[in-house]
Amino acid sequence: MAMLFRPPPSQCRSFSPFVFNYSSREVSSSSRLSLKTSGDEENWVSRFRSKSLSLVFSGALALGLSLSGVGFADAKVGVNKPELLPKEFTSVIDVADFLSNGQEKRIAQEIANLEKDTGFKLRVLAQNYPVTPGLAIKDFWQVDDSTIVFVADPTFGNILNFNVGATVDLDIPRSFWSRLAGKYGNMFYWKEKGEDASIEAAVMAISSCLREPVGRNNCAEIQ
């Protein structure tokens, strides 16, 4: 089970690859309307979670592609290229060559320390769609409810995209992911500083957030 996150439209001109809109309020010039989730809507979200994981790992970016002229029916078929996976296990897969060897090692070490300290499993995939292992990473990483899959892909503007397991979703405010994407994933940031800088900054921010005590104000600031 998983939740998908994208930055809100105001923070990204293009549609982000992995899409789930958590906006609970729409503001007009005359009023602000609060939307409450009904029991039926909650059931729908639950069903969506169970189906969303396979769509994310397909690498098809189905909803995003539908805005680029590719229909959902075609996009949802997805990508499954296990030949793009490394031969040995690693928590960082960079098929787009955004990261240097040293950066990959630093990120992998940070991820290992995080998993040891918290039990949460962060996994990083850097890609340029459609060059992606797609569905194959699900089994390669043995993705479960304690896993955060961070996909760095600049195809649709904002480079930061997240698939968050249900256990993680219980502890981390949902707004954290959109705020993180807005700060380090926007096109202006990664074009100026580089894709590698966006990836490293996001990993450190996630690590810092996951180490904070769970409470009303955890992850309030993006480190």
Curated annotation (Swiss-Prot):
It is found in: Plastid, Chloroplast thylakoid lumen. Transmembrane segments: none annotated. One of its GO terms (cellular component) is chloroplast. Pfam families: TPM_phosphatase. InterPro entries: TPM_dom (IPR007621). Keywords: Chloroplast, Plastid, Thylakoid, Transit peptide. Coiled coil: none annotated. It comes from the Eukaryota. This is Thylakoid lumenal 15.0 kDa protein 2, chloroplastic.
